[in-house]
Regions:
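N-terminal active-site beta-alpha-beta segment that forms phosphate/nucleotide-binding
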Residues: 43-124, 128
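Conserved phosphate- and dinucleotide-binding cores of soluble alpha/beta proteins
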Residues: 1-45, 113-187
Length: 187
């Protein structure tokens, strides 16, 4: 109803709304019906997060973790990079760095697989466009990126998959983030 919100609290003006759809079956993520730690309502105990299994991906993630310095603001991408926070957690280094996700989470413990892009126990959430403004300003220390292929000349393929059904995955925020990163670590 008109006047029910203060003007600065309005996110979508009524003139732009034709319908409101209530979807009670809407999930929070593709694999999560609802998890209050993702929305910041509760804090999930650090002991509840699973660690990486032993194998090549773990060795790579451990090596990447050695490059991180206390106080770093670090963007992470999908793939092996997404496991680095678990390595720090296991090493008792949780909180040494601040994780920055494209989707807007700052801090906390970034989640994995189809929950990637979310974080439990985040310190803050920014709208994704504001997070990208921060990335474009170069205010972060480094980014941990995954890739599909890297050529001998240093060219990086992040979006073209060789087989169907996934002919292209899309570059996501790769270009914006890597163009403004002080350091880039591929894993």
């Amino acid at each position: 109803a008109a006047g029910s919100l203060k003007p600065k609290e309005v996110r979508i003006p009524g003139v732009l709304v034709d319908y409101i759809v209530i979807a009670p079956e809407q999930t929070q993520t593709t694999q999560t019906q609802y998890e209050p730690a993702i929305s910041g309502e509760i804090s999930r105990p650090l002991s509840a997060f699973r660690y990486m299994e032993h194998g090549p991906a773990r060795v790579i993630a451990q090596r990447v973790a050695q490059e991180l310095q206390s106080g770093d603001a670090v963007n992470i991408g999908f793939g092996i990079s997404a496991n680095v926070p678990r390595i720090l957690l296991e090493q008792g280094r949780h909180g040494d760095v601040t994780w920055l996700l494209e989707q807007g989470a700052i801090g906390g413990v970034p989640l994995l697989e189809f929950q990637f892009g979310c974080a439990s126990n985040a310190e803050a959430f920014l709208p994704s466009p504001q997070q990208f403004t921060y990335f474009q300003g170069g205010g972060f220390d480094l980014t941990l990126m995954s890739f599909l292929q890297i050529g001998a000349d240093g060219s990086v393929n992040v979006s073209h998959l060789p087989a169907r059904p996934h002919v292209t995955a899309g570059c996501g925020g790769f270009i914006d983030i890597t163009s403004h990163a002080k350091r880039i670590i591929f894993s």
